Amino acid sequence: MSDQQFDEYLKASSHLSERTILQYNNQFKKFEPMNKSLVTQSQTNIISFVDNNGGSNNTKLAMLNIAINVRKHFKKEVNKMLTRKLQLADDYQQEKNAIKEEKKSDLPTTKELIAWENRQYIDKNWNAFIVVHLMRVLSLRNKDLDLKIIPATRSQRKGEAGDKNNYLILRKRNSQLVRNDYKTFKIYGRKKNVLQSSKLNKAIRELVAERDLELGKDEIRLLSTIGGKKMNEESIAKKIRSFTFMGLSESDYNKIIVSEIAEMKDIKKLETISNNRGTSLEVLLKEYHLDV
């Protein structure tokens, strides 16, 4: 299979997001040792190659998935590959369940997360406080925290059509988070959350002053490079973990909170988390409840 054929498949798959296309390209490159022959090779050979070169079950699934999609596009058989995909998916789920069991005893409580958050405020670690506070109260992903801090002036908060930025808007008595760029945006659209927290407002003002910047005049990013520029996703994830309790990931934070609320059987709170995060209640419980 040529790169040109793969490009043909991508062009025909207009529903794919930029992120997904990038991931597909990365998986396709892994078939280089077999000349990327996803169309001409037999299913058995492709399965064998993936099993021997894929590494983790999750990576094998990703490789097999792109191979299946490409072969379907060119009307080639995929029955054996689909069977292998089901087997790998089952193995991967068992691995995830085992990890959940380990995390049940290792992860801290929500009270500990809040105590850490409060300590950041006391110690005037404004950037850290804002990050962990937003992540906890709104169940945010890393990407959601890639945002600009702006004032509540109409001209700045209106935004342009197709705006792909996230904003933390500082208002007189509260603040508002506006998300135009997050994982499930195409499904749930723009999200707006008002945050009634005087501590958060103070932390935002102090962070701006600490950086010697002017709100509304300078570009102010919550997470940025030393020079104040936009960070890539990997750097954002590392930066966030430098602020969190015990270096936990945003996924760990969500697992702690979801699991505790699920144990209390508080459906309304779970629905709020589901809405804030931009995911279904079913996925929320399956992926983040440690007892499921």
What role is predicted for each listed range?
Residues 21, 131, 144-148, 273:
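Alpha-helix N-cap/helix-start motif at helix boundaries, enriched for small hydrophobics
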Residues 146-155, 260-261, 276-278:
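Amphipathic alpha-helical scaffolding segments
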Residues 108-143:
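Basic, Lys/Arg- and aromatic-enriched nucleic-acid-binding interface segment
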Residues 186-253, 257, 262:
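Active-site/catalytic core of tyrosine-dependent DNA strand-transfer enzymes
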Residues 147-193:
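Conserved tyrosine-mediated DNA breakage-rejoining catalytic core shared by Y-recombinases
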Residues 79-118:
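Flexible interdomain linker/hinge and immediately adjacent N-terminus
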Residues 3-86, 251-255, 278:
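Non-catalytic DNA-binding core/recognition domains of DNA-processing enzymes
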Residues 246-247, 265-289:
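Short, polar N-cap/turn motifs at the start of nucleic acid-interacting alpha helices
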